[in-house]
């Protein structure tokens, strides 16, 4: 019986690198939401858009809009008029976290209040049909440091640097 030759992992890696060099760069896939392109979504009436969003968002939209949300809609229309004229629209600051992102809002920058500050978020195609509040989390993961002098009762036994 002939012994099989053992290969080190180095030769395979070289082959893979050569293959990667010959591959053409990837094209960006055209965005579609539930089978509709962004242009189709922007031309679509709001009633038709309500039919294709998930039930939670559909229910929120069906209940109507509050006076605060109506004010936000007016700000969005004003910003959209400015961008159509070629001017740079300012950040739209809002406390309305329960507002559903519609196709007409894409490309605008929002300052969404998270309970402490306004997080600036530029809305892209992938955010259609979500709530504004999903883009600005209210809680952050706490990164505690090591205990120092006076930090805790147990830090008495931590040697002084």
From Swiss-Prot:
Residues 1-26 are annotated as: Disordered. InterPro entries: Ribosomal_uS19, Ribosomal_uS19_CS, Ribosomal_uS19_euk/arc, Ribosomal_uS19_SF. Protein S19 forms a complex with S13 that binds strongly to the 16S ribosomal RNA. One of its GO terms (molecular function) is structural constituent of ribosome. Residues 1-19 have a biased composition (Basic residues). Belongs to the universal ribosomal protein uS19 family. Keywords: Ribonucleoprotein, Ribosomal protein, RNA-binding, rRNA-binding. One of its GO terms (cellular component) is cytosolic small ribosomal subunit. It comes from the Archaea. The keyword rRNA-binding applies. This is Small ribosomal subunit protein uS19. One of its GO terms (biological process) is ribosomal small subunit assembly.
């Amino acid at each position: 019986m002939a012994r099989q030759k053992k290969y080190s992992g180095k030769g395979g890696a070289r082959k893979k690198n050569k293959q990667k060099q010959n591959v053409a760069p990837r094209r960006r896939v055209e965005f579609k939401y539930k089978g509709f392109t962004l242009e189709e979504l922007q031309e679509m009436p709001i009633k038709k858009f309500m039919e294709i969003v998930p039930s939670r968002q559909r229910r929120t939209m069906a209940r109507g809009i509050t006076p605060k949300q109506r004010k936000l809609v007016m700000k969005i229309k004003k910003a959209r008029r400015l961008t159509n004229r070629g001017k740079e629209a300012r950040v739209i600051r809002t406390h309305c976290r329960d507002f559903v992102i519609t196709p007409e809002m894409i490309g605008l920058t929002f300052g969404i209040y998270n309970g402490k500050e306004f997080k600036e978020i530029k809305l892209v195609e992938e955010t259609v049909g979500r709530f504004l509040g999903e883009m600005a989390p209210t809680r952050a993961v706490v990164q505690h440091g090591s205990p120092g002098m006076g930090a805790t009762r147990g830090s008495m036994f931590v040697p002084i640097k």
